[in-house]
Amino acid sequence: MKHRANGIDLFRIFAATMVVAIHTFPFQSIAPFLDEVITLTVFRVAVPFFFMITGYFLLGRLSLNFSYNNNQRVKKYLYKIGMIYLYSILLYFPLSLLNGTISLKMNILLLLKVFIFDGTFYHLWYFPASIIGTILVTLLLRSIGFKLTVAFSTCLYLVGLGGDSWYGITNQVPLLNKLYTFIFSWSDYTRSGVFFTPVFLCLGIFAYRVSKKLTASKILNLLFYVFIIGMTFESIFLHRFTNVKHDSMYLLLPSCALILFLMLLNWQPKLKVKESADLTLLVYILHPLVIVIVHSISKYIPILKNSLLNFLLVVVCSFILAQLLLNLKRKLRVSKQKIPFERASKEISASAIHHNINEIRKIIPKNTNIMGVVKANAYGCGMVEVAYELEKIGISFFCVATIEEAIALRKSGNQGDILILGYTHPNRINDIKKYNLIQSIVSEEHGKVLNLKKIPIRCHLQVDTGMHRLGVTPNVTIIQQMYLFSNLKIEGIYSHLGSSDSLEQESIARTNTQIFLFNNILSDLEQMGISYGYTHIQSSYGILNYPELSFDFVRIGILCYGFLSDYNSPTKIPIDLQPIVKVKASLITERIVEAGEYVGYGLGAKVEKRTRIGVVSIGYADGIPRALSNAKLTLEFKGQSIKQIGNICMDMMLVDLSEVEDISLNDELIVLPNISKIADEEQTITNELLSRLGSRLGTELN
């Protein structure tokens, strides 16, 4: 929704100014009636606007999907607002004591009333109201759904309305009088998180739900004018003919706030205000302090007692003070740029990831989507960073091997579907549910035990078509039974090809048998009337050697990272790949070793002449194979080749710097300049070499 935020962000400034006006009465010295009509009526849209922002950006997604990440966002918001409220209480504590809002002589119940509902200073009610309202709406959404939540919140607002601007009327009804007497024993006003906040949070949620369909409309403008004029007449009537207890709530205020918010979503001003949310939050918190200061100064400068001038001065000073604090925050904040890893790191190329995915998309059918296989820490490249980049280019389905990997990916903020390819013990079923993961059913027994747990979970059914590793027996009767289990929501079915990386005749025959068996199972299930969900059987080599296949997904692993597993095995379809990872380490010290001396562990490396030796801060614990010791590994620095000498140690390695120019301590060297060549020389595959890269290596995404 970032493309719709410009109008909202700019209006935050106007709304914050309106709040200042409500607390300063700018027209008091000129025409008090204008304060009644404008300040205490029209400007009342300001606070609902801020609550609607919370509903739109925080609870909108939650109302559609109670995922782990959406729930975490709510928890973080509540914690943040709670801390802001605490700091604000401390800031205004002396003034709260002076004006009697709180007193050390108050009993516990009265203090709770002040802290939970009223706020310890007149503007601080907003923060507990936001917390209570958010908790209430979240619980209602979870238990009764959005429509009933709106209805319930509307009823709460109407109750609150009767204790606010309409109190002069409702107070005449004995039963209602008793109700409001009880309510006011707990809160000075009905403008609170119980009666006021929920309806505006719901309106923000509604705006989120309709925002994609929203278009600019003159009808919205007309409706806004109708409702704002109607609310003005409502206010005039209530102020003139009734005893208004407060004027925060009007019958037409929700309608005005909703139409205004929808108009702002369509408004795309060129002017953009940086950090408008933080700026206006600080203005809201600080402006009463500025009011006190300006009021004190006005005793010595009488002209400042002019209400309009007083208001303008408070607004200007509040924004200046808020901006100064933001500037200070930037200076104190740790630089957003990652601190360079002084020891060793992996540099991940975002552009290479994009390139590789684009090349893959050229090969697969247009209707086939990509699953990003990010197991084993994205083949050693950095699971969180790679998945983040894949999400940016439209990949929203990810595969991992274990539930621990899946949870780590979800906790990183990943919003996509996450399929666990491997076995997960049924005792972890609560975690599968909690983190909204998709579990592979890897055997008949696995499926039966998971179903007996009586906790509904999302699943994909893995079928053993000939790999003979994981998967249920390719018997359609058994598979049908899995689909009938009430607690297994099977959303897809898949298999794995055991020999798709080879074009030898025996490998082709095995692969074709697997594909034939898989297709037959799908056909039989279809004839049985079973909706089997998504289908996928190809991994990286499956798309290169069997591009004619057309299933819902392909599982892309090694190709995403810019490598083939084995460059000696030809593929039917060529592909232009760019390696996404560079392994770098720092030169941490150097020294001269005289001829005839041994270096490193053992006696395998003896220098024949006076040699300049350097120490590079990476070793076999970081994934560099120890078998590459003694000149089998070549590093690079600014295009120069540097030979590794001696045995590679756990945490470092030695290099010969005798022929290297312009290298200094702390310079970074490329440690594995040609991963595919090294894998070939070590008679392994690039998958293994990459997956060895250790967790001590930092990850830099560029």
UniProtKB/Swiss-Prot annotation:
<keyword id="KW-1003">Cell membrane</keyword>
<feature type="topological domain" description="Cytoplasmic">
    <location>
        <begin position="1"/>
        <end position="12"/>
    </location>
</feature>
<comment type="similarity">
    <text>In the N-terminal section; belongs to the acyltransferase 3 family.</text>
</comment>
<keyword id="KW-1133">Transmembrane helix</keyword>
<dbReference type="GO" id="GO:0008784">
    <property type="term" value="F:alanine racemase activity"/>
</dbReference>
<dbReference type="GO" id="GO:0046677">
    <property type="term" value="P:response to antibiotic"/>
</dbReference>
<dbReference type="Pfam" id="PF00842">
    <property type="entry name" value="Ala_racemase_C"/>
</dbReference>
<dbReference type="InterPro" id="IPR020622">
    <property type="entry name" value="Ala_racemase_pyridoxalP-BS"/>
</dbReference>
<feature type="binding site">
    <location>
        <position position="469"/>
    </location>
    <ligand>
        <name>substrate</name>
    </ligand>
</feature>
<dbReference type="GO" id="GO:0005829">
    <property type="term" value="C:cytosol"/>
</dbReference>
<feature type="region of interest" description="Racemase">
    <location>
        <begin position="337"/>
        <end position="702"/>
    </location>
</feature>
<dbReference type="InterPro" id="IPR009006">
    <property type="entry name" value="Ala_racemase/Decarboxylase_C"/>
</dbReference>
<dbReference type="InterPro" id="IPR000821">
    <property type="entry name" value="Ala_racemase"/>
</dbReference>
<dbReference type="Pfam" id="PF01168">
    <property type="entry name" value="Ala_racemase_N"/>
</dbReference>
<feature type="transmembrane region" description="Helical">
    <location>
        <begin position="219"/>
        <end position="239"/>
    </location>
</feature>
<dbReference type="GO" id="GO:0030632">
    <property type="term" value="P:D-alanine biosynthetic process"/>
</dbReference>
<dbReference type="InterPro" id="IPR029066">
    <property type="entry name" value="PLP-binding_barrel"/>
</dbReference>
<keyword id="KW-0663">Pyridoxal phosphate</keyword>
<feature type="transmembrane region" description="Helical">
    <location>
        <begin position="192"/>
        <end position="212"/>
    </location>
</feature>
<keyword id="KW-0046">Antibiotic resistance</keyword>
<dbReference type="InterPro" id="IPR011248">
    <property type="entry name" value="Serine/alanine_racemase"/>
</dbReference>
<dbReference type="GO" id="GO:0005886">
    <property type="term" value="C:plasma membrane"/>
</dbReference>
<feature type="topological domain" description="Cytoplasmic">
    <location>
        <begin position="213"/>
        <end position="218"/>
    </location>
</feature>
<feature type="transmembrane region" description="Helical">
    <location>
        <begin position="121"/>
        <end position="141"/>
    </location>
</feature>
<feature type="topological domain" description="Extracellular">
    <location>
        <begin position="298"/>
        <end position="307"/>
    </location>
</feature>
<dbReference type="GO" id="GO:0030170">
    <property type="term" value="F:pyridoxal phosphate binding"/>
</dbReference>
<keyword id="KW-0812">Transmembrane</keyword>
<dbReference type="InterPro" id="IPR011079">
    <property type="entry name" value="Ala_racemase_C"/>
</dbReference>
<feature type="transmembrane region" description="Helical">
    <location>
        <begin position="13"/>
        <end position="33"/>
    </location>
</feature>
<feature type="modified residue" description="N6-(pyridoxal phosphate)lysine">
    <location>
        <position position="375"/>
    </location>
</feature>
<feature type="topological domain" description="Cytoplasmic">
    <location>
        <position position="142"/>
    </location>
</feature>
<feature type="active site" description="Proton acceptor">
    <location>
        <position position="375"/>
    </location>
</feature>
<dbReference type="InterPro" id="IPR002656">
    <property type="entry name" value="Acyl_transf_3_dom"/>
</dbReference>
<dbReference type="GO" id="GO:0016747">
    <property type="term" value="F:acyltransferase activity, transferring groups other than amino-acyl groups"/>
</dbReference>
<dbReference type="Pfam" id="PF01757">
    <property type="entry name" value="Acyl_transf_3"/>
</dbReference>
<keyword id="KW-0413">Isomerase</keyword>
<feature type="topological domain" description="Cytoplasmic">
    <location>
        <begin position="61"/>
        <end position="77"/>
    </location>
</feature>
<feature type="transmembrane region" description="Helical">
    <location>
        <begin position="78"/>
        <end position="98"/>
    </location>
</feature>
<protein>
    <recommendedName>
        <fullName>Amino-acid racemase</fullName>
        <ecNumber>5.1.1.-</ecNumber>
    </recommendedName>
</protein>
<keyword id="KW-0472">Membrane</keyword>
<feature type="transmembrane region" description="Helical">
    <location>
        <begin position="143"/>
        <end position="163"/>
    </location>
</feature>
<dbReference type="InterPro" id="IPR001608">
    <property type="entry name" value="Ala_racemase_N"/>
</dbReference>
